[in-house]
Regions:
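Catalytic machinery of carbohydrate-active enzymes
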Residues: 1-177
């Protein structure tokens, strides 16, 4: 099973996807899980053992030429066209994730139902948008929809050995700690 998770949001939002990753990997232990997210938020998941590849979307500044923006968008989308994903889970309501889902030939495409009928056509399984729930619960809705048992709702972050060593050095250098 080859899976693509899409979350184009901020650092905390990306971290809150980790329960979904762990539950998917527990149910599909031999799966390949890729993650598409905004550049600058990858530190929350770059050491996560449940992720095989990370695709970074680099935002452009508002002064960038419209043609350069368009080329950048097209090049980003092209990365996904020939990937043979079985499952796409888009946890973002915007158009970028919907376009990626539409371009792939995945058998299952899960995304949030929006007011846009065009965006909704990118998916064959729609999730209701429910803003009155904790984001972890919303992020776990795809596994519920697929009838995958939820083993854990805990958020987790992983650090490299270099990160741990650097932190220990800094802590050891503090007085009265």
């Amino acid at each position: 099973m080859k899976i693509l998770i899409i979350k184009f949001r901020n650092i905390g939002d990306v971290l809150l996807v980790t329960p979904l990753l762990r539950n998917l990997k527990a149910f599909y232990p031999d799966s390949i899980i890729d993650f598409a997210l905004n550049k600058g938020t990858e530190s929350m998941i770059d050491e996560n053992p449940n992720i095989d590849r990370i695709f970074l979307y680099e935002r452009y500044d508002s002064n960038t030429n419209i043609f350069k923006k368009l080329i950048k968008e097209i090049n980003f989308f092209r990365r996904f066209r020939h990937e043979k994903y079985d499952l796409i889970i888009n946890l973002t309501e915007g158009d970028r994730g919907a376009i990626i889902a539409k371009l792939t030939r995945a058998r299952l495409k899960i995304g949030y139902q929006t007011k846009s009928k065009i965006l909704n056509k990118s998916y064959n399984l729609l999730l209701p948008l429910q803003h009155n729930r904790h984001i972890i619960e919303s992020n776990l809705d795809p596994v519920r929809l697929l009838e995958i048992p939820i083993k854990s709702k805990s958020v987790e972050i992983f650090f490299s050995a270099d990160d741990i060593n650097a932190s220990e050095e800094k802590l050891n250098g503090l007085k009265n700690f």
